[in-house]
Amino acid sequence: MKLLRFGPPGQEKPGALDAQGRVRDLSAVVDDIGGNVLLPASVAKLRALDLAALPLVAGEPQKSLRLGPCVARTGKLICIGLNYSDHAAEAGMQVPPEPVVFNKWTSAIVGPDDNVEIPRGSVKTDWEVELGVVIGQGGRYIAEADAMPHVAGYCIVNDVSEREFQIERSGTWDKGKGCDTFGPMGPWLVTADEVPDPQALRMWLDVDGKRFQSGSTATMVYKVPFLISYLSRFMSLQSGDVISTGTPPGVGMGQKPPVFLRAGQTMHLGIDGLGTQTQLAVQA
């Protein structure tokens, strides 16, 4: 099932994509797509719905109908750095002995096709297509063997990054990762039953039609079950939390010479089975 949120920013309503690619309104069924709605029992009830019996929403999704972030009220957007060995190499860094964990502030989250703002003073804004893992059943100290039932579904995250803020200006990575609009999410949450193997998904990203990133989740260093277990040692995972699992090679700072995003350029990215995103870069 593909769960989504449609409408103007801040006024999104819950919806689902039907078999014909049209949006059906779930407002009479749930208040939004997030929190307890993502618990396993709640998702099972949504999957059992006859979507054809629900109101049809006018407009074509991602064209005449805006989609918002696919998860509402995200409590935590937890990111994993250097989780593809070939990306670590292009960044000139070693594969870490444990996952590199950082945060994206939830104020960075926007819809899949909303504009991305290049921050004032930025000279090194970059792109990163990533697989997002949406937590359904929360927990602490989750065993790796028990991790997958905690997943509600998957989505695309563009982990937009400002490399000077992130790397060159001391402190943690967070200030180069959490700028407003740096977390496009969606277009929809694909429930876990429709993604039999999250480690076998092709992913890509283009800038102005040029392919920069092309990879597969198969080359992750730390796989989804391990990441869930690992993170749960340090924090409670809660329904609606999102784990952004790292990016394959092809980011701007890894080019020779490096290239970075400029206002007026367009990013187009996707992951097999999870849809696509398109963002115009604008100056903040």
Show the residue positions of the predicted features:
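N-terminal non-catalytic cap/leader segment that marks the start of a structured domain
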Residues: M1-P99, H268
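Catalytic-pocket segment enriched in acidic/His residues
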Residues: R5, P9-G10, R66, C70, ...
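N-terminal accessory regions of nucleic-acid-interacting proteins
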Residues: R140-Y154
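Structural signature of FAD isoalloxazine-binding scaffolds in flavoprotein oxidoreductases
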Residues: Q94-P112, T125-W127, R262-G273
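A structural-propensity feature for long, helix-poor, extended segments
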Residues: P112-G132
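Short catalytic-site patches enriched in acidic/histidine residues
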Residues: V100-P119, G139-R140, T181-V190, P248-G252
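Residues embedded in well-ordered beta-strands
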Residues: P14, E130-V134, C155, W204
